[in-house]
Amino acid sequence: MKTSHNRANKQRKRNKIANKIFLLVLLFIFGFFGYKYINSRPAEYSQMIPQKYILRDFDELCNQIESSYMNLPQTKKYKDIDFLSLKPNFKSKIKLESGKKKDEMSTQEVFDLYNDILKKLYDSNVRIADKQTFNEILQQDNHNQILNNLSIKRYSNLAEEIPEKTFRAYSIDNYKDALYVKVSDFDSVNIQQDAQIFSNILKTNKKKNKIIIDFRDNDSDNLDYAINVIIKPLLKSDINVEFNVANKTQPIISKNILNRNGISFKTTENVSNIKINDNQKSIKYITIFNLVIKKSEEQKCDVYILQNKNTRNSADFVCQIANRTKFATTVGETTSGNGLNIVHTYKALPNTGLIVEYPLGQGLNEDGTTNEEVGTIPAIKLDDNSEIVKLLLSRIN
């Protein structure tokens, strides 16, 4: 009996120990998954953004760039910078800067910090969208696919950029039979007003038989301006032109800006009939854009566009359309490109609500080369210097 009693006591002790171990395991499991749940929940809005959310969204930002942004090879090749390999350095910078603010930062501070880091891509088209861009996204038909619940609250805390000028001041010079107009940028408070000013300049000088438009050092990104202010009044006849953009992922494209500028598009997974380089192995989709523009003036002059290595974005777009349709003759140096990929993609980050903006694809030149890498080659090659107008006139007169 005594032995049986001892066995029972030992069994009870073993059961108690087993129960304690079981409870400890349960507590560990609940604690572990509870911690994971708490730390994986989307952030709730607060005026200040905790460091953990800033770091988490920076990871997401890098993931988007790695999966969808196509110009990383160019950055590595021409700037000798491997952006993604620098990610630990960037995260250390985030920890350092947020540590100065008690491990939390304001919306404006995170906005500035992310954009400062993104400068290392050497592409002004990759950025955290500003408040003006956010307001434009709100008007897009696909804004629900872009924004999250935090975005509207977060962007209410961002400062609105005040335009530095309220009207367009073109630099004009007159030669014997040529009008010269310098267009240094496409920044505009009122595109309709600028279009009227530019049109009046052309009408006032309609006795000239040559128009020289200077886009050197113009890197503006404003498709509305490029089409409505510059191209339309310079056309001698209507134009209808196609151009292609290559993508790694299925593009989400808002029709708003395209429809109002006479641009239609279709995206296809069949790239067999598209001229592309052998090194473009990551291309999965091609978006074919079709641009139709009706002439707005009775233009009879020959048009020449000056370009250099600093001409890019929407100014490069005008140069590309000029080369393809011959509405103007391009003159100068090869541009820096970025003109054909007219659509940016936007995605709100899950924990801060800030919006990442970047070109989703790469424009393809007519020979299949990448516009972002090769640029736009001028029809007439001339060195970029102060005598370029005189050199051009001596050649074409």
Which positions does each model-derived feature cover?
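Flexible, low-complexity junctional segments that flank or bridge functional domains
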Residues: K2, R7, N15-R260, D302, ...
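Conserved active-site segments centered on acidic
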Residues: R12
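Conserved acidic, small-residue-rich alpha-beta core segments centered on
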Residues: K36-N39, N228-E387
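Short, hydrophobic-biased amphipathic alpha-helical segments
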Residues: L113, D384-L392
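Juxtamembrane/interface motifs at transmembrane-helix termini
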Residues: P378, L392-L393
